UniProtKB/Swiss-Prot annotation:
Role played: Regulates secA expression by translational coupling of the secM secA operon. Translational pausing at a specific Pro residue 5 residues before the end of the protein may allow disruption of a mRNA repressor helix that normally suppresses secA translation initiation.
Subcellular location: Cytoplasm, Cytosol; Periplasm
Signal peptide: 1-37
Keywords assigned: Cytoplasm, Periplasm, Signal
GO molecular function, one term: translation regulator activity
UniProt protein name: Secretion monitor
GO cellular component: cytosol; periplasmic space
Similarity-based family: Belongs to the SecM family.
């Protein structure tokens, strides 16, 4: 009986919880927190600007197509539990992808002979996962161009000229007198 419970616990730790956590994170990324349609009245004061924000952010599941118009995350702040879940998923992936003593074996082999491309790709993936776990995310820098590009002044759009030039159709009188 103890063996069955131990195997069930190992199965849950290896397969069930990481996949459940990954599904929860994937389902919650990019979706507004008030998707249920109930505005959070406790967090906002009763002012006219906060009421307009509540009305603007309230969505239901039948209007998910309108979500692309809503600016979902105006700042780069990440929810603590979402960040914790992402790090846990990345940690699970890194442990699942890392063979026993992969770094030591591949480094020894690399010194003596060429390494297979799959091992190099696996190490690159592990390094990327390690970087995701250990480095803090910084928002991208805003790059502003100091020079303005000189563009030629175009005449206003005239459908008759366009038809004459592109389509070869004369649209208008023969003489412009």
């Amino acid at each position: 009986m103890i063996g069955i419970l131990n195997r069930w616990r190992q199965f849950g730790r290896r397969y069930f919880w990481p996949h459940l956590l990954l599904g929860m994170v994937a389902a919650s990324l990019g979706v507004p927190s008030n998707l249920s349609g109930v505005p959070d009245h406790a967090a906002l004061a009763n002012t006219s600007s906060s009421q307009s924000r509540q009305n603007h952010g309230t969505t239901n599941f039948n209007s998910l197509a309108l979500l692309h118009d809503i600016h979902r995350r105006p700042s780069f702040s990440v929810d603590y539990w979402q960040q914790h879940a992402l790090r846990t998923v990345i940690r699970h992936l890194s442990f699942a992808l890392a063979p026993q003593a992969a770094y030591a074996r591949v480094q020894e082999v690399a010194e003596t002979e060429r390494v297979a491309p799959s091992k190099i790709q696996q190490l690159a993936l592990l390094d990327t996962l390690n970087a995701l776990l250990t480095h803090e995310f910084k928002p991208p820098a805003i790059i502003r161009y100091t020079e303005q590009v000189e563009r030629p002044v175009l005449s206003p759009y005239k459908p008759g000229l366009w038809l004459a030039q592109v389509q070869g159709i004369r649209a208008g009188p023969a003489n412009l007198s």
